[in-house]
A protein has these predicted regions:
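Active-site-adjacent loops and short helices of periplasmic peptidoglycan-processing enzymes
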Residues: 1-81, 90-93
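Domain-terminus/edge residues, biased toward the C-terminal soluble/receptor-binding domains
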Residues: 60-61, 72-77, 81-208
Length: 208
């Protein structure tokens, strides 16, 4: 991998596919992403095709994946809205939700069996903000600092996305504090009250 971070896999070493997920989510391992792509689809190109199919399925309309790791390519792009949709979808998977909430993971290698490596989560928001439940950092020279995160308070889960933001930790905290303060539920008990509420990314365009 020409640029970026790694979980530092070596030729001949063996780990579980779930360990590659840990390497990606904790250490931002580009090598882990590429290894997973080869294992699942046979090549990064074919895996990226599957990524695009899933993106379309969940309503990501301004995204095109070219590299499994997220490293720069002229045709590799997304938007804050699409990343929020992806994070919301991913959090529905219990394995992902549990993994992204961890501050560190220790990987026990299959080969060599004696090797164990601890990987710390790059997402500092887990330590800086008590309501943070997970997220993913990202950085390249072209994209700058990018952060997708989630937080839960009083039964309400929110997702926040910033792109090319040098002050991402503080900005996410400020945005969450504002959103949680302003959010309120409405108990509709009046049988005469009825309205169509528009939805984004759902099975229907609106609910009544």
């Amino acid at each position: 991998v020409a640029e970026g971070s790694s979980m530092y896999l070596k030729v001949g070493e063996k780990v579980r596919l779930s360990d590659l997920a840990s390497g990606m989510m904790m250490a931002s391992g580009n090598d882990a992403a590429n290894a997973a792509a080869y294992t699942i689809s046979g090549s990064p190109e074919k895996f990226s095709q599957r990524m695009n199919e899933k993106a379309k399925q969940i309503g990501m309309t301004n995204t095109n994946f070219v590299t499994p790791s997220g490293l720069d390519d002229d045709n590799h792009y997304s938007s804050a809205k699409d990343m929020a949709l992806l994070m919301s979808y991913a959090l529905e998977n219990d394995d992902f939700a549990n993994l992204t909430a961890k501050k560190s993971v220790t990987v026990e290698f299959l080969e060599p069996k004696s090797k164990k490596t601890a990987y710390a989560n790059h997402n500092r928001l887990l330590s800086l903000y008590p309501y943070c439940t997970g997220g993913k950092t990202g950085y390249t020279t072209a994209a700058g600092r990018c952060l997708v995160s989630s937080a839960k308070k009083d039964g309400v889960t929110l997702v926040c996305v910033t792109l090319n933001d040098r002050n991402d930790w503080n900005d996410h905290i400020s945005l969450y504090d504002y959103a949680f303060e302003k959010y309120r539920g409405v108990d509709c008990k009046d049988a005469d009250f009825c309205a169509d509420i528009p939805c984004v990314g759902g099975d229907k365009d609106s609910v009544t």
